[in-house]
């Protein structure tokens, strides 16, 4: 049920016509405001516009957060001339701690994106007969939500912890293959871009995040599913190379005297 607000205003300006003019000098006005019921608001909203807007807002907040972190660490040199080299150092780093921090930032960002899609799914289910999402859009958002939470949020957060902890726990100065470590991280944004390309083209993957056949085979898949599979290949390559890097580091870079059974439990 919608709500209607009516505001009546009255202003006496003292210009009544003569002593017996009564209220002829009063100025009256009325303002009417209507609030549509939630069902109509949800039905009229474009889910892809809502998703794009919220992701853009999240990216802007992330940019402001980076600027604030730079300001807190460099309060006396808060200019673009200093900020550009600072951010370039982070984007090109091979240091295991910085790469781990990049994993944390990416994981938390996509955790928010996955939460946004979960919220939109719950909006669809909140009202009986709601058509905020069509059947195809619901399947697409369900697929993207699961994919984002597992492959773009949980896995980067785990890799972030591993990048920070494994070299420190075994006494290694860095991972065995630092450049491969950096490349493994940057494969994740590439995979995310491919995965989300389909949904913004109007043909997002609707296979479920597990990608079971026959939904992903060539006879039934559309462009969005193809892009989703390509993105998954990038993410699988990222996690595989990361695993190889960690195994190599643990095998050949342990501190002298540390055997396989002397390593910390986390490693």
Where are these regions (language model features)?
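...captures the hydrophobic TM-helix bundle architecture rather than a specific catalytic motif
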Residues: 1-267
